Amino acid sequence: INAGFPEESAAWGINQVCGSGLRAVAIAAQHVQLGDADVVAAGGQENMSLSPHVAHLRAGHKMGHMSYLDSMVRDGLWDAFNGYHMGQTAENVAEKWQINRDMQDEFAVGSQKKAEAAQKAGRFVDEIVPFKVKDRRGDKIVEQDEYIRHGATMESMQKLRPAFLKDGTVTAA
């Protein structure tokens, strides 16, 4: 409403962790393809760092300890069918299909190199809207993805510890 859209316009949010923005655009495209809409404004951003912790308070709370759930994990990263973190699913898939740590690291290095080359070639310039961030060091303009690991190597990937199991193969790479 504050953006100037009429009250009868449909709007909703999507909570699919990192895939939310992409899913919003895919749903928008489907609405246009199916003839449900002529024009759709869609986009997204993820902010997992600020996902709230939630408590069951509908019926109130009596004396004693109260548990909170991490909504980022519970709503987006928890396997509802098996009752464990999606990271465990990644480990299970790696084991089932015999995808070892070296194979995963090699894939990660390749992905990082492709992203680095695309960033250096300016392929993302039209995809990212620059914005100002204020922090204790002053204002900073963010105009490119900060998490591409320039100069990624197998050696740098192999220094990463397993993320989900002590002897696992899945890392942050």
Segments the model singles out, each with a brief description of its role:
Residues 12, 44, 52, 106, ...:
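Proline- and acidic/polar-enriched loop/turn elements at helix boundaries
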Residues 7-10, 30, 47, 61, ...:
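Preference for short coil/turn "hinge" residues that link or interrupt alpha-helices
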Residues 103-173:
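N-terminal extracellular/periplasmic Venus flytrap/periplasmic-binding protein-like
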Residues 13-14, 74-76, 100:
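A short, structure-level motif marking secondary-structure boundaries and short turns
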Residues 1-38, 69, 81-88, 151-173:
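Conserved catalytic cysteine-centered active-site region
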Residues 16-46, 88, 94-123:
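Active-site-proximal alpha-helical scaffold in enzymes
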Residues 29, 33, 39-93:
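Flexible glycine-/small-residue-enriched beta->alpha junction loops
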